[in-house]
Amino acid sequence: MRQFRTLAMRVRSPEASAAMTHAARRIGLPVAQLPGDPAEVTGLRSADGVAWRAAGGYLTTLIAGGVDIRLHGAGPSWFAGLPRDVTGRDIRLVSVGEAPDLVGPCPAVAKLADEKHPAFSAAWVRNADDLRNRLRTARLPADSTLIIMDHWLDLASEYRIFTIGREPVAWSPYVVEGEEWSPSLRHHRASWHDEAATFVALMLADLPAEDVPPTAVIDVGRTDAGDFAVLEVNNVWSSGLYSCDPDGVLRAVLAANDPDCAPRWRWQPAPALGA
């Protein structure tokens, strides 16, 4: 992996920002705190050994403005291609224009495939007309991509796992029996975070080498019956830490910035989702 000279970072949570800064200092990596306005970013380029860690919309705005940023990881198509016995449901990746026809008269879960948008969060829709109404209200561009899932999973707990290759490097619970994340949630009697990380490791071990992403954030749920399922896949450089080991998270962030990753894993952000 390349030796980086700077970690360019903007993290909204003061606690997470401090944790990442200390992790970088432990390996002798200087940190450049990015300004609130992307237009003020100057002199930082991936080609010069800069690693990036910031919200997807912020980085999308920088890329649209011509800043050299090269990031890699598992994208929506990788998630949609996982087998049903891993995800627990049927998952389709479709354009906004195609999505209502795919949903038809049946209920489904709909969410944006990449990043977040304040006008369109993951939602349970009753049918195609319900989805059309939500899309009309959100005013998403016609070329936006959605993930459509055939049902909502009833979960007892949820977990976040950062990976590099086939290896989980940091993990944490973020919901356990209805209790939202706090620093003490890791000690909840019903938290199965280590088992969730093992589930992810076994899942990645079963994939062909060419289908293992260089890095990923894999969110996993556990049902009341004790079954694990992959809920979604997020970008390493923009995902929250919860109680994940910041040293492991930093390793994953640097892996996502590695220019030697295969081209198929290069992040191609949707311009409409810029900050």
What are these regions (language model features)?
Residues 2-205:
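Active-site nucleotide/adenylate-binding loops and adjacent lid/helix of ATP-dependent enzymes
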